[in-house]
Amino acid sequence: MKRASLLTLTLIGAFSAIQAAWAVDYPLPPTGSRLVGQNQTYTVQEGDKNLQAIARRFDTAAMLILEANNTIAPVPKPGTTITIPSQLLLPDAPRQGIIVNLAELRLYYYPPGENIVQVYPIGIGLQGLETPVMETRVGQKIPNPTWTPTAGIRQRSLERGIKLPPVVPAGPNNPLGRYALRLAHGNGEYLIHGTSAPDSVGLRVSSGCIRMNAPDIKALFSSVRTGTPVKVINEPVKYSVEPNGMRYVEVHRPLSAEEQQNVQTMPYTLPAGFTQFKDNKAVDQKLVDKALYRRAGYPVSVSSGATPAASNAPSVESAQNGEPEQGNMLRVTQ
């Protein structure tokens, strides 16, 4: 079943190049907590051309909105009420530098000396050209990068009837955008960079690099230093026991290795400690099973006696001036 590839093509065909984006800052939770933010609801308006326009408004990935709403169309009808998945569990990793979770199409940045985490949507490698899991660092900051297509990229482009030049100069048409962070992994072939195709952010379409919206990479580029640690993980299932005793799981669709795989039904590799978490008497195992089946992409309470809905979801019936409603757990800044 070629669900993933067909959905990607549908999204790319439907999305227009919209430049507006927002940086989302979450205040760090107390020690021992990983739950941040609040889910929001939004009613699609007449002027909303497509799902990507809505995703950019909330600086999230269109794929995450599709996960959260399950049956929504890539071009939702006006009047449709959708969930914006802006509540999340922080990755189970040290809160420093850059953390990329491929499975959730998100990049986390912990600015040194600040009690916040910045969360950005990203685009990653497609099947056969996957972005690798790695622990590395920012090896080089490159403003106004040029792009030298590899032999493989040039061949794949020729197969689509596109002849690429040996070198693409810096500028608005450069596929790397205006800013690039070269990772020290391997031979330095992997970058975190902008893009001349903003439709691709939030999808699996790159040759292995990590793509960001233009305003997002500009903000990240200005903040990070050479040597900043970078950890790339692939964890579709996250879980947390909060200080107040509440239990949560956040489940994303796993990354498929082949187009024929159905990401809604393919099995998971569960994180360490998950079996013990599920078997605890304070956890409702039926709610865990429902969360693993549903794969909604946002935290769900699985505490015994809880309901399978995410907590604290304020209504954003019609965001004014294109801005989402702001709660005390979420700050949105340009």
Curated annotation (Swiss-Prot):
GO terms for molecular function: glycosyltransferase activity; peptidoglycan L,D-transpeptidase activity. Residues 303-334 are annotated as: Disordered. Residues 1-23 form the signal peptide. It comes from the Bacteria. The keyword Amino-acid biosynthesis does not apply. Residues 303-323 have a biased composition (Polar residues). The active site is at H193, C209. Keywords: Cell shape, Cell wall biogenesis/degradation, Glycosyltransferase, Hydrolase, Peptidoglycan synthesis, Periplasm, Signal, Transferase. Pathway: Cell wall biogenesis; peptidoglycan biosynthesis. Disruption phenotype: Simultaneous disruption of erfK, ybiS, ycfS and ynhG leads to loss of covalent anchoring of the major outer membrane lipoprotein (Lpp) to the peptidoglycan. Overexpression of ynhG in this background increases meso-diaminopimelyl-3-a meso-diaminopimelyl-3 cross-links but does not restore Lpp anchoring. Pfam families: Ldt_C (PF17969), LysM (PF01476), YkuD (PF03734). SMART domains: LysM (SM00257). Residues 96-233 form the L,D-TPase catalytic domain. Its main location: periplasm. One of its GO terms (cellular component) is periplasmic space. Its EC number is 2.-.-.-. One of its GO terms (biological process) is cell wall organization. Interacts with DsbG. Responsible, at least in part, for generating a meso-diaminopimelyl-3-a meso-diaminopimelyl-3 cross-link. This is Probable L,D-transpeptidase YnhG. It comes from Escherichia coli (strain K12). The gene is ynhG.
